[in-house]
Amino acid sequence: MRAFETEKTDVAEVDRSIYDIKDKPNAAFEVDSGLDKAIVEQISTEKHDPDWMRDFRLKSLDIYNSMPVQNWGPSIEGLDMRNIVTYVRPNTEMRGKWSEVPDDIKNTFERLGIPKAERASLAGVGAQYDSEVVYHNVKAEVAAQGVVYTDIESALNGPYAEMIRTHFMKLVPPTDHKFAALHGAVWSGGSFVYVPAGVHVEIPLQSYFRLNAPGAGQFEHTLIIVDKGAYLHFIEGCSAPKYNVANLHAGCVEIYVGENARVRYSTIENWSKNMYNLNTKRAKVEKGGTIEWVSGSFGSHTSCLYPMSILAGEGARMEFTGITFAGAGQDLDTGAKVVHAAPNTSSHITTKSIARDGGISNFRSAVTVLPNAAGSKSAVSCESLMLDDQSRSDTIPEMDIRCDAVDVGHEAKIGRISEEAVFYLMSRGLSEEDARALIVGGFAEPIAKELPVEYAVEMNNLIHLEMKGSIG
């Protein structure tokens, strides 16, 4: 993510153009638009898949063709798979040095601040451009601890092939929903992380996903395995320039958290307003382990995103902290799911949503407590801030409690910006637009404080971008 050096940023100073960079089309190869067996086989050939993966793709395609589109949530009628290009290979192979990445691609990531962030505060970086990872590197001292951080194709065709086969799409099977099946058929790119038992990766790893091609889809797969007693913070960033045609993001994240291990997965999504973001994220947590999700959703035309945690071992814990900002023409349907599948597990879901200019920001939660999960606790809290009379925010909680000896609660709040607070800040010298942006930033502060400082600043600047033009 781009690291801004000043603590205070006026609304007028935030530059949207860094995200709207459009590189000239220069793909080395791309498949035809649409989706059929020939296209899936072509992708598999381009990827040099082992036989089992080729078969997996074709079975996923059959599942995709047999499943209906979900009949709940935002409308995706504007997404026509006949017009989506599912694989675009950039004009470079993966590199281990930024100096070796072609200038047009490198310049895009430079403007987004990825190399700078790597030098300042990251243990390793992966950068994907369209359908392929173009850069991947991990610091030597981290690799020396036995940590594996590489693109997933290298792991699939290398020494970690069996580990990939054992875990790939086991948490999110193609039968999960239609777009999971689509992902299974056409996935490309993404990262593989393995942290050995007892190893603490003290500074974060990051993957950044950039979709440049108009009318294309991005289907990266991130697989993270953190062994017993280990720790990892993984950061995911994404962006794309805006086009007049639909783009699709249907990635997948699978996280395996070992006994007494801890994983934090932070995401700042800034997709363009023509993007359909239909991403699936899931974690399985063993005894005494912890999964922490931190999520910021600021872009896309339509989003369906509900990270799910399966608390499989006694004392496993999940925390989800998220913020969503929906503006004009956006329908963002987000939230979190948790399954308490063992005794004395706990979950805490905290979300904040902001809507303006007719935007729709919905929150969904699903808490399931299985019969063997006695002593478990779950708390769900969501707050919504409406900036006008045209916007909409709904809370849709689900609770499936199959055990008596549990403590489960849900609370929801909705409010508006206080005009008295705006007047006070204006009396202290702020413009009305900056005053409103400051109040919204304060509303989002509990989420920002969960991020490393560079990313908290980035999130606040994205809020400022969304607030531009909020007056009048």
At which residue positions do the language-model features occur?
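Short, low-to-moderate order helix/coil transition modules at the start of elongated helical scaffolds
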Residues: 2-252, 256-262
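Conserved beta-strand/loop scaffold segments within soluble protein domains that form the structured core
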Residues: 135-137, 141, 145-430, 444-472
